[in-house]
Amino acid sequence: MAEISKMAGVSLATVSRTIHSPHLVRKGTLERVNQVMERLNYVYHATAGDLSRKRSSIIGVIIPTAKSLVFSSTLQAIQEAAQQNNFSLVAGSSKYDIETELSLLQQFKERRLAGIILTGFVVGQKDLIKELVKGGMPCVVIWDKLDDSDLSYVGFDNFKATYRITEYLISLRHRHIGLIVGPYTKVERVKRRLEGFKAALTAHGLKFDPELVIEKEPTLIDGKEAMSRLLSLPVRPTAVLAASDTLAVGALAAARDMNVRVPEDISIAGFDDIEVAAYCNPPLTTVRVPAYEIGQIAFKILLGMINGNSDQLQQYCLDTSVIIRGSCRELDNDVISKS
């Protein structure tokens, strides 16, 4: 923790609060400390003495990135529920990398943790999770709906959620829609978002154009770079769906820098409904994801497994909703004729 404190320019107490009570830390400080922890691939080891006891009181949690506020919301819910039940957390970030995620899972297995909460799947990693479960490790997968799965999960239908927001853009008469999406070649749930986007276009007789799809890490700078590319195309899209609000905020910045008005010249929609989405200029149309509720339910399921109260498969697919704000508008007839 001392190295994190030094690199982030904050006190050890602030680092501790970031880990234990992130809701008490200012947003800018929280993001700075989380970025340093992610850069160092830091894993917090709580109450290490529990490892020598018969039953551990530590739960492992793997999230894709500490930079995203939406994953922080899920982590906060798990942390609060864990504290109420006298459990502590080991939290790690996979950085959307399969080797990093497998390494974290192996560490958790070797430390004989009480259970694991895992954010979806990096492509190619599902078999290891099944091995852990068969070996007696309680495990709950979050942030995705797993079809034909023998694993407990709490998530939502990424395919359907993306289909709906794409269909909303189509209802505004957009026919030339760009997509800025996370690492779909690495992450199963992100791949399903791409598939939902494609399916909505096909269902409405629209052609899928790979040139309008840009794969990026879900960061502000990547969202800005991707949007700049889309706006520089000979025929640019009339609407852009960013498959995370972080990417969408970056896209808004790019449009502003290039003097492209939102929504007058181009519509932009996001995904997640993080807190800042409502305060963007213009406020961001997006998909509301029950991030906090996912964490609460996941811990409840895991606690039942740990206590031996439930050996049945539990699978929750929660609802999402399209939140309509000011960043999208219906196309005028003259624009449609040109697109």
Could you describe each region identified by the protein language model?
Residues L12-R17, L51-K67, Y168, H176-P183:
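Short beta-strand segments enriched in small/hydrophobic residues
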Residues P64-S73, A91-T100, V154-R164, I180-S228, ...:
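Hinge/beta->alpha junction and helix N-cap segments in small-molecule ligand-binding domains
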Residues E38-Q76, Q84-F87, K95-D97, Q107-E110:
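N-terminal helix-turn-helix/winged-helix DNA-binding helices
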Residues Y96, T119-R164, Y184-T185, L206, ...:
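Flexible loop/hinge segments that line or gate small-molecule binding clefts
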Residues M1-S57, R329, K338:
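N-terminal helix-turn-helix DNA-binding module of bacterial transcription factors
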Residues A226-S339:
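Flexible loop/turn connectors
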Residues E80-Q125:
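Central regulatory/effector-binding core of bacterial HTH transcription factors
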